Amino acid sequence: EMLFGRLGEKKIYVDMIVQSTGKDNQASISFTVLKKDLPEVLAICEILRKEWKASEVTAKEDIAIVSAVGVGMMSSYGVAGRMFKVLSQHGVNIEMISTSEIGISCVIDAMYAELAVKAIHKEFLEN
């Protein structure tokens, strides 16, 4: 709440958010922001890291978000599996996943964006 409250006050748009707990019950949070906002986001995160005595703040810049979108998609069986399989078959590692009723979005390495879009398009629109 504190982190995203501060980002909201600065009018920084946060898209995908993933929280996980690793070894020793340490929480980790990952989220995507616009590249133009990254320096300000890192500054806010670093302030909070010190307050919370957290271990580190890292950022990855060269990412892309690819999505498969369609009404009622999540109620259709196998959509996520098909998308993940086709990305895997093309050597594309998925770093984050977000789902909604109308779509699935994946964060991937930016260098695979065009390949991923073509592969997803072929899987869902040409098959």
For each of these PLM feature ranges, what is it?
Residues 1-127:
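A conserved regulatory-domain signal marking ACT and ACT-like small-molecule sensing domains
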